[in-house]
Amino acid sequence: MRDHTKLKAFKLADEMAVLIYEITKSFPKNEIYGLTSQMRRSVVSVPSNIVEGCARESQSEYLRFLEIAFGSLRELHYQFTLASRLGYVEKSRISECETKITETEKVLSTLIRSLRKY
């Protein structure tokens, strides 16, 4: 079994989850079951799928869960962009979040590509 806590992709995804939860606290109340909920589900899905993949025995299952995590990450990226365009994200936090999301995408996609070679 792989140790997810040693993966940079997991660490970044975990930090990103905390960041998105903090940011969505200030979203309009009418979005609690809309964009707020969607973003929170997406962001929690990323590290959760990394953890689940690490618990799988086969390399192919591990890779499949990392790919699911990446899909959730791309979904979150769009949702964050939409929330920013709607004015829900404080301007001072946009760059910080954008950087964290993009960095996580790069690290996770690199991990996925390296596993596909084997």
Feature-to-residue mapping (PLM):
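Short, C-terminally biased terminal segments at protein or domain edges
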Residues: M1-Y118
